[in-house]
Design a protein with these regions (language model features):
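Short, small-residue-biased leader/transition segments that mark boundaries at the very start
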Residues: 2-9
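A generic fold-level signal
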Residues: 4, 17, 63-64
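A residue-level signal for beta-strand positions that form part of recognition/binding surfaces
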Residues: 6, 19, 112
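Cytochrome P450
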Residues: 10-17
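Conserved C-terminal alpha-helix-loop-beta "cap" of PLP-dependent enzymes
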Residues: 26, 30-142
């Protein structure tokens, strides 16, 4: 391979190195450190799911066994394509603002948003601020 900087090539995560990322994380944080982080992130995701369920017009669309939450705002009067456009609009507002980074995806042919909580320094206050920003973006997209 001439002209290729092999130092810039990533490690192949095939059969032999599939668990390399996890191994590095366990070596850095230890098993107990990884457990603490996962428990915190799962608790934050479940807290957010409870807040979403408690808020009229908002739905959690799938179980939350780990730290990813699938949600959608379904205000009265919006259905099908209009609801899809609205969902994409408020998710885009959040992503452009930098308040969070959400992943729009389809579920049963309709757009929804995935929130994944897992950054190293994420605390409950960050998740609460994101929830407030999501509701504000949804309100602004509705106008």
């Amino acid at each position: 391979m001439t002209g290729v900087q092999t130092c810039a090539l990533p490690i192949s995560l095939g059969r032999r190195f599939r668990a390399l990322k996890l191994w590095c994380l366990i070596r850095e944080r230890g098993v107990s450190g990884l457990q603490v982080r996962l428990r915190r992130d799962i608790a934050n995701a479940r807290w957010l799911a409870a807040e979403v369920e408690r808020t009229p017009g908002w739905r959690v669309l799938a179980p939350v066994p780990l730290q990813t939450l699938c949600l959608r705002h379904e205000p009265p009067g919006l259905e099908d394509e209009a609801l899809d456009r609205y969902t994409l609009a408020w998710a885009d507002r959040i992503n452009r603002s930098g308040a969070g980074y959400l992943t729009p995806a389809t579920l049963d042919g309709r757009w929804m948003v995935r929130v994944s909580i897992g950054a190293l320094a994420t605390e409950r206050a960050h998740v609460d601020a994101l929830w407030q920003a999501i509701r504000a973006a949804a309100d602004a997209a509705r106008r």
